[in-house]
């Protein structure tokens, strides 16, 4: 019986036919509509023409690799959530994927249930907003314009990605309160489970560098063993 509910559309990209078939089958059984691509160029065409709700993308592919695909999508202002898959587990590799604009990074091998949970988290995050505030929040020389999605330090605009601003907005709305990694994963990335990822630390690092680039004071502080807080020292 047709319930009128449309299943989320996921584009899965991998040049390994066995992996691709396995992911397609698993995601379909989990309730997703699935399209596939076997290389980066095909993935970029499909993402542009068919507008999937999320992309699961292997990082090592012929023609156009995963990082290049994400970079191209973001350059076209396509903010589709992307989960990058890779056998590379080093921090540098994860950072490269995230800096390109990926929303999540999952190391192979992984359990299908975790991939499904992460895709659902990305979709939840996309369907909501990082914050409901309608004000400009000030912390020392930092101004966070929530409705305008702009940040300024000493009156100078700070160039932030969508995810960086989402994280900063959440921290600003809870200024002086220490938020744990788990809380930030849920509020910013939409995770409702204990994800094994250092994505919060990576993005905190991005924000610190950008906020302090002009010689501004340290505003983002780490509370060892607890989490992170936005405040003047």
Curated annotation (Swiss-Prot):
Pfam families: Response_reg, Trans_reg_C
Subcellular location, record wording: Cytoplasm
Inducing or repressing factors: By nitrogen-limiting conditions.
GO molecular function: calcium ion binding; magnesium ion binding; phosphorelay response regulator activity; transcription cis-regulatory region binding
GO annotation, biological process: regulation of DNA-templated transcription
Listed SUPFAM superfamilies: CheY-like
DNA bind region: 134-232
Record-linked CDD domains: REC_OmpR_PrrA-like, trans_reg_C
Function: Member of the two-component regulatory system PrrB/PrrA that is involved specifically in early intracellular multiplication of Mycobacterium and is essential for its viability. Upon phosphorylation by PrrB, functions as a transcription regulator by direct binding to promoter regions of target genes to positively regulate their expression. Autoregulates its own expression.
Protein name (Swiss-Prot/TrEMBL): Transcriptional regulatory protein PrrA
């Amino acid at each position: 019986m047709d319930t009128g509910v449309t299943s989320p559309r996921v584009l899965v990209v991998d040049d390994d036919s066995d992996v691709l078939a396995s992911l397609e089958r698993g995601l379909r059984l989990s309730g997703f509509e699935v399209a596939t691509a076997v290389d980066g160029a095909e993935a970029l065409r499909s993402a542009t023409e068919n507008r999937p709700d999320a992309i699961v993308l292997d990082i090592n592919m012929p023609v156009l690799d995963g990082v290049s695909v994400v970079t191209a999508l973001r350059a076209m202002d396509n903010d589709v959530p992307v989960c990058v898959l890779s056998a590379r587990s080093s921090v540098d590799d994860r950072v490269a994927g995230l800096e390109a604009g990926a929303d999540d990074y999952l190391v192979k091998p992984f359990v299908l249930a975790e991939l499904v949970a992460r895709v659902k988290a990305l979709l939840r995050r996309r369907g909501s907003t990082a914050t409901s505030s309608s004000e400009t929040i000030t912390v020392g020389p930092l101004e966070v314009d929530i409705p305008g999605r702009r940040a300024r330090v000493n009156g100078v605009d700070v160039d932030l990605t969508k995810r960086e601003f989402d994280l900063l907005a959440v921290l600003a709305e809870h200024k002086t309160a220490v938020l744990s990694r788990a809380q930030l994963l849920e509020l910013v990335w939409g995770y409702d489970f204990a994800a094994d990822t250092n994505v919060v630390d990576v993005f905190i690092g991005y924000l610190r560098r950008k906020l302090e680039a002009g010689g501004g004071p340290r505003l983002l502080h780490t509370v060892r063993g607890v989490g992170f807080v936005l405040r003047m020292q």
